[in-house]
From Swiss-Prot:
GO terms for molecular function: sulfathiazole transmembrane transporter activity; transmembrane transporter activity; xenobiotic transmembrane transporter activity. It holds the Pfam family CusB_dom_1. Belongs to the membrane fusion protein (MFP) (TC 8.A.1) family. This is Multidrug resistance protein MdtN.
């Protein structure tokens, strides 16, 4: 009877190798998750502005439609310019009339100035005559007691002195009148400066009646049409700044230790998860509103009672700037996935 050969014992090395590789893979995954944080709690965003007219008026031209892309300098809408054109014409007419008034007044002042120069010469002459008459009277009066002059001579000297003083006062009044005429032109020149400022302001208002795109963007929330009266500083629609797109990714606070400004990131949008976009961390949020109370700004801390022993890590927003965003894919609020590659 033949004996059956015994089977050789199987080596345990392959199984141990598989287990070892699995452990290495597990350690790598854990390390990778810890050092390269990722989150699907993210969304695309961009800066926006409210497009508001700086002057009031009726919209006579609306050059855009809702969700339309625009370039910097493109016409958005135009407010009826006629009231501002009328104000400008009125101000310019006032300036022309004032210039003519200044010219005529200047001619009169020039004539009065010429007369004032003559009056000044007359003033000096009258002042000299008054001084001479006063000196003559002062010398004549003592001679009356000595009998060298008669009382009639003294009266004539006194009359001459009074007449000279009267002539001096008269020419002094003429000089003051000439000086006041010159100051009248200064007032008109100051008034002209005010009219010029009014013209500049009216031109600015006329320019503001035409509203153009301040940057490349996309129009949203447009709910008006031609004929609508637009009030100054009241928004007409919103304009998205499409020059710079970013993703707000909410990471757990335990991941923040590996995140720095400039950390490379890979972005995927839910609308096309097969396409990736490169970016870099711009900044990390430093404040969120706690869901369970916490510190109330401007008051006392409010701490809710809890018997929950499980603490869930808080999430903080991380702003990631996208290098080359696809303008057709990126929309404010679009769901995204962010993967960081700390260096």
């Amino acid at each position: 009877m033949e004996s059956t050969p015994k089977k050789a014992p199987r080596s345990k090395f392959p199984a141990l190798l598989v287990v070892a590789l699995a452990l290495v893979a597990l350690v790598f995954v854990i390390w990778r998750v810890d050092s390269a944080p990722s989150t699907n709690d993210a969304y695309a965003s961009a800066d926006t502005i409210d497009v508001v007219p700086e002057v009031s008026g009726r919209i006579v031209e609306l050059a855009v439609t809702d969700n339309q892309a625009v370039k910097q300098g493109d016409l958005l809408f135009r407010i009826d310019p006629r009231p501002y054109e009328a104000n400008l014409a009125k101000a310019e007419a006032s300036l022309a009339a004032l210039d003519k008034q200044i010219m005529l007044t200047q001619r009169s002042v020039d004539a009065q100035q010429f007369g004032a120069d003559s009056v000044n010469a007359t003033v000096e002459k009258a002042r000299a005559a008054a001084k001479q008459a006063t000196d003559t009277l002062r010398r004549t009066e003592p001679l009356l007691k000595e009998g060298f002059v008669s009382a009639e001579d003294v009266d004539r000297a006194r009359t001459a002195q009074r007449a000279a003083e009267a002539d001096l006062n008269a020419v002094l009044l003429q000089a003051q009148s000439a000086a006041s005429a010159v100051s009248g032109v200064d007032a008109l020149v100051a008034q002209r400066a005010a009219v010029e400022a009014d013209i500049a302001l009216t031109k600015l208002h006329l320019e503001m009646a035409t509203v153009r795109a301040p940057f490349d963007g996309r129009v949203i929330s447009l709910k008006t049409s031609v004929g609508q009266f637009a009030s100054a500083m009241r928004p007409i629609f919103t304009l998205i700044d499409t020059r710079h797109w970013y993703v707000i990714a909410n990471f757990r606070e335990t991941d923040l230790k590996n995140i720095r400004s400039g950390t490379p990131a890979t972005i995927r949008l839910m609308s096309d998860s097969g396409k990736t976009f490169e970016g870099k961390v711009d900044s990390i949020g430093y404040g969120v509103l706690p869901d369970d109370g916490g510190l109330v700004l401007g008051g006392l801390p409010k701490v809710s009672r809890s018997i929950n022993w499980v603490r869930v890590a808080q999430r903080f927003p991380v702003k990631i700037m996208v290098d080359k965003p696809d303008p057709e894919m990126f929309r404010i609020g679009a769901s995204a996935v962010a993967n960081l590659e700390p260096q």
